[in-house]
Amino acid sequence: PVLVTLWTRPITSKTPLAIDNPEKLGTMAVAELLRHEGISVSKADSVSKAVEASRNGATIAVVNADRLSLAERKALAQAGGDVVIVGVRGGSDTLKGLTDMTSKGAASPGSTILEPQCGDADAQAARSLAGSHASVSLQGDDDAVGCFPVGEDRYAYATDTLPSGAALRVLADPGPATNAHLA
């Protein structure tokens, strides 16, 4: 009998906010926490695959949403699954096609502890955020709910209803989802 073993290294990424990035700016820790809770976590290599997964009830987390075309954002908004936007760039069209909320550059220092000040169950479960490097404005979006205010009409986290009826959640600053924050 012969036993052959092959030592391999796990494939990891250095891409910021990637679920397979174990470095400070990665989100491997949050992916592992979700898996521990029984939630399947995977990455889609195309918008069409993400839209298909959304049609099948998956929640889609989007980083760098500003790199999607307006048509791609609209397709996600219509697909039927919940969408979570992780990180927005102030003044960009990151949210266009998904909601009437707009991304803003207003921020609060990391030393500031933000309280939810809304009834959203996820925000209440989080209890607080340590500052925010970005925000969203609800101006022009009458049914959106802002949480963790960083200033007048500026929120670190907000929710809205997508055209499909599913939920949109926006975490303006991706920092709280990173390995550095969860370590």
Question: What is the predicted function of each stretch?
Answer:
Residues P1-A183:
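Short, surface-exposed patches at the edges or C-terminal ends of soluble domains, predominantly
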